[in-house]
Amino acid sequence: MGRVAGWVVTGVGVAVVLATLRDIVHTLWHPSGRGGLGRTVLAAVWRAGRPRQGHRRARVLAGPLAMVVVVVSWVSAIVLGWTLVYWPHLGEGFFISAELRQTSRGGFLDALYLSMVTMATLGFGDIVPTEEWLRIAVPVQALLGFALLTAAVTWVLQIYPALTRRRALAIRLSLLRRSNAVRVLSEEDVPMAANLLEDLAGELVQTRVDLTQYAETYYFRDGEESASLAASIETAVQLAHAAERSPRPDMRFAGRLLDTALADFAHLLDEQFLRVGGSTEAVLAAYTADHGHPVRGTG
């Protein structure tokens, strides 16, 4: 490989590493969590695991599997990038042990081996950098490998509290549905009803914030229908409509508050994931169907 071509390959490797780091930062620490590669991989795994008859377990595993695929994609991209950085310089920029030199080493596979070993912070010592900039580059990759491991653990720790809050809201809505809360609100005067609806609106706002911050939570399906917000969201719509028809001013206000929170949540779903472009009820019905639950209608 010529000197100019070698530096071009090195430049491509640096670009791959920087693009991957940008994606990691945007996925994990950007306020809206919008990493290009991560988001594409998540959506692809989600589409591959769309609900099919008899594949319930596969649907539940779609979210965790997608996260694993994203992390593997990040690791693979960084390893490939650093491989391209090292490859043109193996002949002159590294000391290769006598055992390896006897077998005419110094090709792409050796660069890949060096990149993988460095990424894993193992450092066997059979290929050692000698040029000054490479003596800096190799430890930098090792630091990136450790940082990526830490980031992957942080990612998991970030999203599971958001999933817990979403499931808690879903279970609360499921309990209200099983308690015939919609009928009670329509036919009886319940003193605590307005406060209940305001609390539901607040929890829905928190869920919307979580989905904005951790977009990957959308791709997590819940095994139990009672714990799935996609299956329970219609109850919130029915409660809001029932409250808006109440003769009590506080109930009508609470109903409008919940209805507005639902509209904002539906707008986020439609803008980021569904793109059906319909009413709030239509978007929420699409959300329910996308997670593999039957659409019963909001009444």
PLM features: what roles do these ranges have?
Residues L28-R56, S97-A98, A168-L173:
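Membrane-interface amphipathic/juxtamembrane segments adjacent to transmembrane helices
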Residues R177, A181-M192, L196-G299:
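Soluble C-terminal extramembrane regulatory/interaction domains of multi-pass membrane proteins
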Residues V60-T83:
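Membrane helical hairpin/interfacial module
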Residues R50-M67, D126:
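Cytosolic juxtamembrane amphipathic/interface segments immediately preceding
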Residues M1-A5, L18, R22-H26, I78-E99:
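Juxtamembrane "helix exit" motif at the C-terminal ends of alpha-helical transmembrane segments
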Residues Y160-V184:
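Membrane-proximal helical linkers
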Residues G6-R34, A66-W74:
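Transmembrane alpha-helix/interfacial motif
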Residues G13-I24, W74, W82, L100, ...:
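Pore domain of cation channels
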